[in-house]
Amino acid sequence: MDILKAEIARKRKQLEEKALVGGEKKYFKRSELTAKEKEEYFERCGYKMQKEEEEEKPSSSSNPVLELELAEEKLPMTLSRQEVIRRLRERGEPIRLFGETDYETFQRLRKIEILAPEVNKGLRNDLKAALDKIDQQYFNELVAGQETTDEDTQNDLKVHEENTTIEELEVLGECLGQGDDNKDMDTINKVLKFLLGVWAKELNAREDYVKRSVHGKLASATQKQTESYLKPLFRKLRKKNLPADIKESITDIIKFMLQREYVKANDAYLQMAIGNAPWPIGVTMVGIHARTGREKIFSKHVAHVLNDETQRKYIQGLKRLMTICQKYFSTDPSKCVEYNAL
């Protein structure tokens, strides 16, 4: 009995030392005792428990990146007011809250972008984005008050200077498809960039009022979109890692384009983009024996336009350059596709 009383007294003294009971306080929470024991454990191990201040304002997010950004000193506005408004509207947020300054709106936009980054960027309309970029260029020109001088060319389309002519490319085209893949890729790269440059020069040579019209902006946006679509293809050509089946088809297309056989080039394009056979639907592999549709699933029969979005885009860009080539380097109507369509 004495042992039990001594143990109860020891426990009571331990609680009084930890300030859990004593005076008018006769009860305590188990969580308080656990917290005290945890704190003592960390102190014995050489760590210090950091107590959260009750007066601290509740954080709007547990994102450490956001807390770090908000804790920094005030940074200057790196975006214009128009850009801030555009980004807020894209996210369905109000462009200004009551009593909010331009800088506070900018800070709110930064907070929104960190908390909810754009996850549907790839689903945007590329042509609309190119149109918006061209509109912004003309708007910046108007705001700056520029007059019609040589400086207006800064808003023209980018021209790829290949320092070559169509005659030189036609000579290079005679060597296409003879087994030298690296040389073929270099020739394809030159031809595509040459056509982009020809297209850009023609658009830059237009009158200023034509450039600012709806049709003029649409033509410029289409050229910009095509150039952006072809960037992955240019990268593969530069690194010499273009897939063999795609390379073979594009080689045939470029070869026929340089020979001004646009009907044959279009047939080669359809062969690459659509293929001979549709994708098989249903069961293609049961047990150890492949079914009939299985044997058609290889590079020469499938539709590359269905592979992924990147391939679809540069295949579409290639078709536009085929049309541009037919427009500027014409031949007999019988060898053209949709003659005088442009």
From Swiss-Prot:
SMART domains: SFM. It holds the Pfam family Prp18. The keyword Nucleus applies. It is found in: Nucleus speckle. InterPro entries: Prp18, PRP4-like, PRP4-like_sf, PRPF18. Keywords: mRNA processing, mRNA splicing, Nucleus, Spliceosome. Belongs to the PRP18 family. Interacts with the spliceosome. Part of a complex containing U4/U6 snRNPs. PANTHER family: PRE-MRNA SPLICING FACTOR-RELATED, PRE-MRNA-SPLICING FACTOR 18. Participates in the second step of pre-mRNA splicing. This is Pre-mRNA-splicing factor 18.
